[in-house]
Curated annotation (Swiss-Prot):
EC number, UniProt record: 2.1.1.166
Protein role: Specifically methylates the uridine in position 2552 of 23S rRNA at the 2'-O position of the ribose in the fully assembled 50S ribosomal subunit.
Keywords, ordered alphabetically: Cytoplasm, Methyltransferase, rRNA processing, S-adenosyl-L-methionine, Transferase
Protein name: Ribosomal RNA large subunit methyltransferase E
InterPro entries: RNA_methyltr_RlmE (IPR050082), RNA_MeTrfase_FtsJ_dom (IPR002877), rRNA-MeTfrase_E (IPR015507), SAM-dependent_MTases_sf (IPR029063)
PANTHER family noted in UniProt: RIBOSOMAL RNA METHYLTRANSFERASE (PTHR10920), RRNA METHYLTRANSFERASE 2, MITOCHONDRIAL (PTHR10920:SF18)
Amino acid sequence: MAKNKFNTAWLHDHINDPYVKMAQREGYRARAAYKLKEIDEQDRLIRPGQVIVDLGSVPGSWSQYARNKLAKGAQRDAEREGGIDGTIIALDILPMEPIADVTFIQGDFREDTVLGQLEELVGERQVDLVISDMAPNLSGVAVADAARIEHLCDLALEFSQNHLKQDGALLVKCFHGSGYSQIVEKFKHQFKVVAARKPKASRDKSSETFILGKHLKRPA
């Protein structure tokens, strides 16, 4: 009974969520698009001509937002080819419905074959921005969940170290709680500028926050 009440309450909140309504109205696949939008407007992360990689992209709302931001002229419909000033590459283990002007690679970005596809698309250019809204399946066991979250952040950090240009940026989703301070320290070890962002589009009850790292430190 308690579970049914929880599900009913969640569904009620979801249906009445202004960001859910806005996403439906503006054609975004998830309300998460507005989290990236708010952070981008604050930090001006997405700019014309960039190479952007979206790790764990499914269902695709972050790639949609990035695509719309880079769209040429008045072409802002993410479901229609219109050309963009830049390159967006989305990666996920799960399949993703196509997004106009976004190249999708299905597979594990830790695998050489997937990285090979990415490097072929990027060519001699380095990546300007890595974004990741990845989150593990949470078990409710704090220690186990913290380890899973930290692991995903480690993967994004490693990917950025290998592919990000010197003045590039990495934005990842994290959660306040056990292990959070360790993740921040890892960012500080790798980036000159580190900041935490809690967009208004994040649900009030959620402990999620986003960590932004800018300007890679040169290896010692």
